[in-house]
Structures are given as structure tokens and as C-alpha cells.
């Protein structure tokens, strides 16, 4: 099912809706005990939700082999539409063997709740090493995305899905805004141009600077932190959200910013994930997307601006969303303000950069990072979280 939308066209032209109606849900629930079951981990469950609400439009389900291979090799679906990350449901061979193509499969969450169904159109084996090198640019299993890839099952189950059950987010129900809702909100605010910002980290001054630079040239900012699965050493989502709320209350014009959660999981695929994140924000109704330094990167696997260069591999207008590329921002002691090398005449020793590692070290000690790096209220919130208070 597709739905009519406001504003910029979703990826592929139509916003997908795979949320079962009450009648459809009743039909599937009547079959609940008869259907073979597959249990979803946190990432697969978030993918199910994102497909169903249209965040992954034009996908209607988990990828069949032709789409999967085309995406891995060429960053396109088989119909030629740009798409950078494979969206698959991978299971062990012993789970896949008894499943028959053409049948419905019951999808359960980790607690055994019946959350969705998959119409199994195909099951296929895939090459993990090939996917790792093409998508993540490495087969090093120390890379968190590659690690997940090598730990998951060796058979992909493909086919359209229906979402049967989705509870309000247990921590952030008021920020659970789906693509149809965000588009309606943008329309009601009369925003014609909207820039999306992806983050898995608390907002620091450099982020604030580039967001406000972007806000100078568009109508609204869609602040869209990711709350799906992340690395164990990333700042927990509840802490990050409290930091975003502080920023919204004190440092942003509230009539020009919308804060919402992004339920999808991180892949840490760097450049390819930047494309993926841009397409997701396009589906939510954004016309522009901020791409900063090492977007969706981890460690030293990607170059500082590789996630910006990858947008140049597509023809102008082909992605349907405008990347706003920003250099690494810093605090300039000469000009007493945030800047980049494009706007500051400063020497390297006049630029204040703090690594995430250094900041975490300060926070664990209960020490506030310098105000040039973080707003004091945000730093205080992070200290409370790091010290368990």
C-alpha cells in the first residue's frame, strides 16, 4: 500500500505503508500458531519497522537476490534507483531449511511477540566477504558493521512484509514521528526546504555550528537522532535525547526545528551509509541533508570526507535530496567563535579540537569539557550519566 504525501516526492515516487489494517491483522493473528516462526534481533526488528512506515521507501520487504547483489555491487536497486545499503533478513541454515517459498512466515521479536509477517518469495545464500569489502570497504571483523555481518546467518530470507504490532517507543513516545507525520508537520509549518541531521552522538558545539549554518539557508531543521542499535560504547539513546532536549530549550529557535527519533540501526558503513541516511531523510520529507566529517564512520576505516565524495558518484538530482557538505568545525581562539578552515584565518594552534575519547575521559572524571567544545548544560548531563547519578 502507498499513501499520498506532502512536499518532496519519496524515494521511488511513493511513500510505502506496510502496516497491517485491523482486518489484515485479525487474519494473521488467527493463523499465529500455524505459521513457522523466525525471531528478529534488534536490527532486523528496526528494519521491519522502517520498511513498514515508509522510511525505507521504495522497499516493501527484505531484498531478493537480484536487488541485493545490485546494491552490493553498484549501489542501485535492479530498477536502477540509487540505494547504498542491503536490507536483508539473515538466518542460520537450519532455520531456513524447513521454510517454503510462497508461504507466510511469522516474525517474532526477541520476547516472542508476534510483530509481523513475511511472504517468503525467495531464500538465498550470499557472500559475506564480498558484501563486507563492497559495503564497508573492509573485511576486518574489528569493524562493528563487519562483525555483525559475519555473525549473522548465511541465508537471506526475502519478500514483502506486514507490520502487525508496534508499541509506542518506551522512552521517547512523543518523538516517535513517522514519515507521513513529519511531512504533514512540514506542510503545516509551510516549510518548503528542510535540512535533515543524522546523529548518534550528543550535540557538541561543532554540530550546533553546522546545523545553524544550514538553518540560515533553509526553512527548517529536522533533528533526527538515531535510537536503534549502536555500538556498546556509544552514548545511550536516553542520555543523548536529554542533551537534544536541552539544546532545543536553550539554544535553538523552537519554531524552526523539529526533534524526532530515527528508529533504524547503525551499520557504521561510512560513505555508503551517508547515502542511505540521506535517502531515509528524503522519505521523511527533507529536501537537504547535512554531511559532515567522517559521517557514519568508525575508527580509521574511512577518509575524513569520503562520505561527502560518494555523493559525486551520482548524477545531479538523481538522489532527489541535496547534500550540504561541511568541513570539520572547531573553536577559533583568534576570532573567538566557531569556524572551519573556509572561514577562519587561524593557525592550527589557534584551533580547539577535542576528540571523543578525550571528552569521555574528562566526563568520567567529572570534569566539564571547555565551553568551546560543549554547552555547559549538556556537559553536566553527560557527567551525570557517565557517573551513574
Swiss-Prot record:
It catalyses: sulfate + ATP + H(+) = adenosine 5'-phosphosulfate + diphosphate. Its EC number is 2.7.7.4. One of its GO terms (molecular function) is sulfate adenylyltransferase (ATP) activity. It comes from the Bacteria. It is an enzyme of class 2 (transferase). CDD domains: ATPS. GO terms for biological process: hydrogen sulfide biosynthetic process; sulfate assimilation. Keywords: ATP-binding, Nucleotide-binding, Nucleotidyltransferase, Transferase. Pathway: Sulfur metabolism; hydrogen sulfide biosynthesis; sulfite from sulfate: step 1/3. InterPro entries: ATP-Sase_PUA-like_dom, PUA-like_sf, Rossmann-like_a/b/a_fold, SO4_adenylyltransferase_pro, Sulfurylase_cat_dom, Sulphate_adenylyltransferase. Belongs to the sulfate adenylyltransferase family. PANTHER family: PTHR43509, SULFATE ADENYLYLTRANSFERASE. This is Sulfate adenylyltransferase. It comes from Microcystis aeruginosa (strain NIES-843 / IAM M-2473).
Amino acid at each position: 500500500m502507498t499513501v499520498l504525501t506532502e512536499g518532496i516526492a519519496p524515494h521511488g515516487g511513493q511513500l510505502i505503508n506496510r502496516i497491517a489494517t485491523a482486518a489484515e491483522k485479525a487474519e494473521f493473528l488467527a493463523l499465529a500458531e500455524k505459521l513457522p516462526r523466525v525471531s528478529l534481533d534488534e536490527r532486523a526488528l528496526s528494519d521491519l519497522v522502517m520498511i513498514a512506515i515508509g522510511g525505507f521507501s521504495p522497499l516493501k520487504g527484505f531484498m531478493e537476490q537480484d536487488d541485493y547483489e545490485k546494491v552490493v555491487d553498484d549501489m542501485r536497486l535492479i530498477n536502477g534507483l540509487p540505494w547504498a545499503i542491503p536490507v536483508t533478513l539473515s538466518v542460520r541454515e537450519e532455520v531456513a531449511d524447513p521454510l517454503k517459498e510462497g508461504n507466510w512466515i511469522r516474525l517474532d521479536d526477541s520476547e516472542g511477540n508476534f510483530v509481523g509477517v513475511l511472504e517468503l518469495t525467495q531464500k538465498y545464500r550470499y557472500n559475506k566477504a564480498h558484501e563486507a569489502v563492497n559495503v564497508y570497504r573492509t573485511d576486518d571483523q574489528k569493524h562493528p558493521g563487519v562483525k555483525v555481518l559475519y555473525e549473522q546467518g548465511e541465508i537471506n530470507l526475502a519478500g514483502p512484509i506486514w507490520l502487525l504490532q508496534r508499541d509506542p517507543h518506551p522512552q521517547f513516545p512523543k518523538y516517535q514521528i513517522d514519515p507521513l507525520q513529519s511531512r504533514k508537520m512540514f506542510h503545516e509549518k509551510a516549510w518548503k526546504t528542510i535540512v535533515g541531521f543524522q546523529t548518534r552522538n550528543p550535540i557538541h558545539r561543532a554540530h550546533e555550528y553546522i546545523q545553524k549554518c544550514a538553518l540560515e539557508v533553509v526553512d527548517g531543521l529536522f533533528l533526527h537522532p538515531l535510537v536503534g542499535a549502536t555500538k556498546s560504547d556509544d552514548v545511550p539513546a536516553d542520555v543523548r535525547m536529554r542533551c537534544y532536549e536541552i539544546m532545543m530549550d536553550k539554544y535553538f529557535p523552537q519554531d524552526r526545528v523539529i526533534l524526532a527519533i530515527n528508529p533504524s540501526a547503525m551499520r557504521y558503513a561510512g560513505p555508503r551509509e551517508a547515502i542511505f541516511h540521506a535517502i531515509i531523510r528524503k522519505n521523511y520529507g527533507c529536501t537537504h541533508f547535512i554531511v559532515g566529517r567522517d559521517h557514519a564512520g568508525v575508527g580509521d576505516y574511512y577518509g575524513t570526507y569520503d562520505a561527502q565524495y560518494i555523493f559525486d558518484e551520482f548524477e545531479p538530482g538523481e538522489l532527489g535530496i541535496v547534500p550540504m557538505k561541511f568541513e570539520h568545525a572547531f573553536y577559533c581562539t583568534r576570532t573567538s567563535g566557531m569556524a572551519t578552515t573556509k572561514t577562519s584565518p587561524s593557525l592550527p594552534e589557534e584551533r580547539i579540537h577535542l576528540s571523543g575519547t578525550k571528552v569521555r575521559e574528562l566526563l568520567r572524571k567529572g570534569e566539564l569539557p571547555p565551553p568551546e567544545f560543549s554547552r555547559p548544560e549538556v556537559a553536566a548531563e553527560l557527567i551525570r550519566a557517565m557517573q551513574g547519578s
